[in-house]
Amino acid sequence: MAEFVRAQIFGTTFEITSRYTDLQPVGMGAFGLVCSARDQLTGQPVAVKKIMKPFSTPVLSKRTYRELKLLKHLRHENIISLSDIFISPLEDIYFVTELLGTDLHRLLTSRPLEKQFIQYFLYQILRGLKYVHSAGVVHRDLKPSNILINENCDLKICDFGLARIQDPQMTGYVSTRYYRAPEIMLTWQKYDVEVDIWSAACIFAEMLEGKPLFPGKDHVNQFSIITELLGTPPDDVIQTICSENTLRFVKSLPKRERQPLASKFKNADPDAVDLLERMLVFDPKKRIRAGEALAHEYLAPYHDPTDEPVAEEKFDWSFNDADLPVDTWKIMYSEILDFHNIDQANDAGQVLVEGAVADGQQAFA
């Protein structure tokens, strides 16, 4: 039985195993607090994310379950990796991942980025997205603060808690609006991997300019700003709008022509502008895919088709449409024990999954 130690961080109780010491707050999100810590077993710094009250509602239970399954499934150099999971006696859940020193948002607000860093960061973002998309996963909330970077400029995409959620209420968040694809704003329902390419394009443009490309005050203003640069959406895109109110709004906007991006990004490499043109396309079907973007001339210094892997298998989304009570979502506890046992099997050559899972399920029965 693990020994738990309590600490107060920003008025929040962190109840973690004694394996992790030297807690320091590094970030606070809508669904949890993140601290840095020292792993006494490995001697390495780690990030410990507390999911507060994960079983308080069915929605939050499902969200936590989704993030856990995704972190277990997605194994890639440009995706944050999960090293430990535990549930405290207070029934809070803690995810332990590798610790990276900063994120892209902090970098962008501290200094302009040189060309080689912009290239390398974009390459790694797209390399990660190629893998994620091949697994049948849409991140959906890609933004600079979800892109972690260490002192060696290694980059990892994090925060998959919102992946593949189709929830219009989430679209009101100011922090994510700037990077949101137009098809999400226009239809609020059907979208696919192309939304992440749009977000990556907005991040790319921000790296080039040092400021957000589409800093809308609200969704109406956001869409107007987009059309000022990219012109009025094509008729076939407008025809996909499902909301009558949105359709009336779009048709009421003045007709605008697409502006050459070279006129806005005057100091950028022509190859950078060309790639951005291919990423910032209204019609998602015509937007460049991650694998195609990796092969673009702008990323030639880093592109290596033999080292840009795809997922071995698709992610199992069968649970995602389930509308279950909190007690049923507590099956995630068995997943946590399963994760530990798989790691132990890799180290010690033995698996004790079945008994541990049974014990975990009984504990929450």
UniProtKB/Swiss-Prot annotation:
Binding site for ATP: V26, G27, M28, G29, A30, F31, G32, L33, V34, K49
Cofactor(s), by name: Mg(2+)
Phosphotyrosine modification, residue list: Y173
Catalytic activity, as annotated: L-seryl-[protein] + ATP = O-phospho-L-seryl-[protein] + ADP + H(+); L-threonyl-[protein] + ATP = O-phospho-L-threonyl-[protein] + ADP + H(+)
The EC number(s) this enzyme carries: 2.7.11.24
Catalytic EC class: transferase
Any one biological process term the GO annotation gives: stress-activated MAPK cascade
GO cellular component: cytoplasm; nucleus
Protein localization: Cytoplasm; Nucleus
GO MF terms, alphabetically ordered: ATP binding; MAP kinase activity; protein serine kinase activity
Pfam families in alphabetical order: Pkinase
Domain of life according to the entry: Eukaryota
Active-site residues, record numbering mapped to chain: D141
Motif (TXY): 171-173
Maturation and modification: Dually phosphorylated on Thr-171 and Tyr-173, which activates the enzyme.
Phosphothreonine: residues carrying this PTM: T171
Domain commentary: The TXY motif contains the threonine and tyrosine residues whose phosphorylation activates the MAP kinases.
Protein name: Mitogen-activated protein kinase hog1
Annotated organism of origin: Aspergillus niger (strain ATCC MYA-4892 / CBS 513.88 / FGSC A1513)
